């Protein structure tokens, strides 16, 4: 159950469906998001910073044994929310340029919307 101090998750993906993630990987992602919502800092091997996208951006690293894939979930830590900016299958050693651009765009759009409501 969320307390008043917990940060909400703001899903900034283009679709509301998640990738075909196995049950254990889905549970792990949910657990890690819950820790983030409570204000806990995550470190390797669960999470790492992604300064190429922005100073507040990190990625969750989820190994999905059921599907034999590794997932990456890009997220930003904002003052009032955890921003989920992308969820993709890790296929290469480096993050694809398309993913980096998409995450940057979503964060810009979010920040612009925040400025308009201030």
Q: Language-model segments: which ranges?
A:
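Basic, Lys/Arg-enriched alpha-helical interface segments
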Residues: 1-69, 78-82, 88-118
């Amino acid at each position: 159950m969320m307390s008043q101090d917990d940060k909400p998750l703001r899903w900034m993906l283009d679709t509301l469906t998640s990738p075909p993630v196995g049950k254990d990987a889905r549970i792990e992602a949910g657990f890690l998001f819950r820790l983030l919502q409570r204000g806990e800092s995550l470190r390797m091997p669960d999470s790492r910073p992604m300064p190429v996208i922005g100073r507040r951006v990190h990625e969750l690293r989820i190994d999905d044994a059921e599907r034999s894939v590794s997932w990456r979930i890009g997220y930003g830590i904002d003052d009032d929310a955890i921003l989920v900016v992308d969820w993709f299958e890790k296929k290469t050693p480096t993050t694809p340029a398309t993913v980096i651009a998409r995450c940057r765009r979503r964060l810009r759009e979010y920040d612009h919307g925040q400025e308009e409501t201030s």
